[in-house]
Amino acid sequence: MDHRIALKPNTPLCLSNDSGEMIHCIIKNEIGRGGSCIVYEAVRITDTGDQTLYRIKEFYPYKLHISRNNNELVPSVHDMDSFQKGQKQFRCDFSHTNRLFYSGDNYSSMTNQLDVFNQNGTSYILSAYSSENTLAAYKPVNLKECITLIKQVVYVLGNIHKMG
């Protein structure tokens, strides 16, 4: 059973990157979980009052003992070192994925990651919103679609592994 506690809908996030740039957004809902993260749909209200939609990936590893205290993630003393190493890897993965996205190949199935932020004792990756269904929700209608999807995933994973 997954013991992680997701951010609640309407939770405000004020994210700042290493350059001091800030973005204010509001969590709309959780859309997925992986072994190292929880993914949310979020919204930012522009100066004109329009909504800009984002995907936010929160570094929150499943296997570690981490509590959430007022939206702050607090790893146990025993897991602090593993958490910090994982967080560093999370940030490196952002850079690898960004290089892959802009490598000139067409990765229509990849999200455009915009920036990485540290906040609430963890890291967040901000991505451009995609109106496409998530991979978990995608239901191929036939074997040909399944094979096409698998080939795309294998191709991207192969390139990720080549990058280290």
Language model features with spans:
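AlphaC helix of the protein kinase catalytic domain
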Residues: 134-143
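ATP-binding glycine-rich loop module of kinase domains
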Residues: 43-95
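Juxta-kinase regulatory segment immediately upstream of eukaryotic protein kinase catalytic domains
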Residues: 1-22, 26-29
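Protein kinase glycine-rich loop
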Residues: 28-35, 39
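Conserved short submotifs of the Hanks-type protein kinase catalytic core
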Residues: 119-134
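Protein kinase catalytic-loop region centered on the HRD/HxD motif
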Residues: 155-164
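Short beta-strand micro-motifs within the conserved protein kinase catalytic domain, predominantly
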Residues: 102-123
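Activation segment signature within eukaryotic-like protein kinase domains
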Residues: 149-150
